[in-house]
Design a protein with these regions (language model features):
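A structural signal for multi-pass alpha-helical bundles of membrane permease subunits
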Residues: 2-263, 267
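Single conserved hydrophobic/aromatic residue that forms the stacking wall/gate
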Residues: 266, 271-275
Length: 275
C-alpha cells in the first residue's frame, strides 16, 4: 500500500514539474526561432539556433540600457534593505522596550499591504518632491516596501539563535555593534541569504511601481522595456525577438535559483562566533 502511495506521489510531482517547466522550455525554444518558423508551428523545435533574435531584442527595445537600470535598482535596493533590516531585526529580536511588541505587530500586519494600495498617494507625494523618474528614489521605495516581510522573517531567525554566544562575546569585551556584526550576522546568515534572494528577485521582476514612477524612457527597467518591445513592433510582432527578450530577463533569476541551494550548504554555524 505504501509503495502504491509513494509512486502516486512521485507521478504527481513529475506531472507538476512538467507543467511548471514546460513554459520555460517553450519560451527558450521559441527564442531561437525565426518569425516564419514560429508562425508555421509554435510548438515545433527550432531548425537552428538563431541568435539574431537576441541581437534584435537588445537593440529594438533598448534592452541594454534597461538591463543596466534593472541591475542598478536591484543591487541598490537590496543593499538599502539589508542596511536597515539587519539592525532593526536584531533590536526587535533581542531587546524589550516600550512599544517593541507593538512595532513587531505593525510590521507583521504591513506584510498584507500591497504596493498597489498606496500607489496613487505615493505617486502624488513623489511628484510633489520631484521624486519621479529617479532610480535611487525608486530603490528606497522598493526597500521600504519590503521591510515588513524581511523584518518578520529575519527576526524569527535571530530569535532562534542561543543567547549564550552573545553573552560569551560580551564577557570578552564586545560592544553592541560587534555583537551585531561579528556574532549575530554570521549566525543569521541563512536568514539573511533567504531575504536577500527573495527580495532581489522581487526587485528585478517588479512592474507596477516602476510603470507608475518611471515615465522617462531612459530610466525604465527591464519589465517596462519588454512592454516597449511591443510598442516598437506595433502590429508586426517579431515573436523571436520577444521571446529572446524574455529569456534575457529570466537569466539573472535563474542564476539566483541555481546558486541558492549551493550557497545554503555553506551557511553553517561557526564554532567561535566572536573573534
Amino acid at each position: 500500500m505504501k509503495t502504491v502511495r509513494t509512486w502516486c506521489i512521485r507521478i504527481l510531482m513529475i506531472l507538476f514539474t512538467i507543467i511548471f517547466l514546460y513554459p520555460l522550455f517553450w519560451n527558450l525554444m521559441s527564442a531561437f526561432k525565426t518569425n516564419a518558423e514560429y508562425l508555421t508551428d509554435p510548438y515545433a523545435l527550432p531548425l537552428s539556433l538563431n541568435l539574431d533574435n537576441f541581437v534584435a531584442a537588445w537593440q529594438k527595445a533598448n534592452i541594454a540600457a534597461y538591463f543596466g537600470n534593472s541591475v542598478f535598482v536591484t543591487v541598490l535596493s537590496t543593499a538599502l534593505l539589508l542596511l536597515f533590516v539587519i539592525p532593526i531585526s536584531y533590536v526587535l529580536a533581542r531587546y524589550r522596550f516600550a512599544g517593541s511588541k507593538l512595532i513587531s505587530t505593525i510590521y507583521m500586519a504591513c506584510i498584507f499591504l500591497q504596493a498597489t494600495y498606496i500607489m496613487i498617494p505615493l505617486f502624488l507625494e513623489l511628484q510633489a518632491i520631484n521624486g519621479l523618474n529617479n532610480l535611487p528614489v525608486l530603490c528606497l521605495v522598493y526597500a521600504v516596501m519590503q521591510f515588513p516581510f524581511c523584518i518578520f522573517t529575519l527576526q524569527g531567525f535571530m530569535s532562534a539563535v542561543p543567547k549564550d554566544f552573545e553573552e560569551s562575546a560580551r564577557i570578552d569585551g564586545a560592544t553592541n555593534l560587534q555583537l551585531l556584526l561579528k556574532v549575530m550576522v554570521p549566525l543569521a546568515k541563512p536568514g539573511i541569504a533567504t531575504i536577500t534572494m527573495l527580495s532581489a528577485m522581487g526587485f528585478w521582476n517588479e512592474y507596477p511601481l516602476a510603470l507608475v514612477l518611471l515615465t522617462d524612457d531612459a530610466q525604465k527597467t527591464l519589465p517596462i522595456g519588454m512592454a516597449n518591445l511591443f510598442e516598437v513592433q506595433k502590429y508586426a510582432t517579431d515573436w523571436g525577438a520577444l521571446f529572446a527578450g524574455l529569456v534575457i530577463i529570466m537569466i539573472p533569476t535563474m542564476i539566483i535559483y541555481l546558486i541558492g541551494p549551493v550557497s545554503y550548504t555553506h551557511l553553517t554555524l561557526p564554532t567561535t562566533p566572536y573573534v
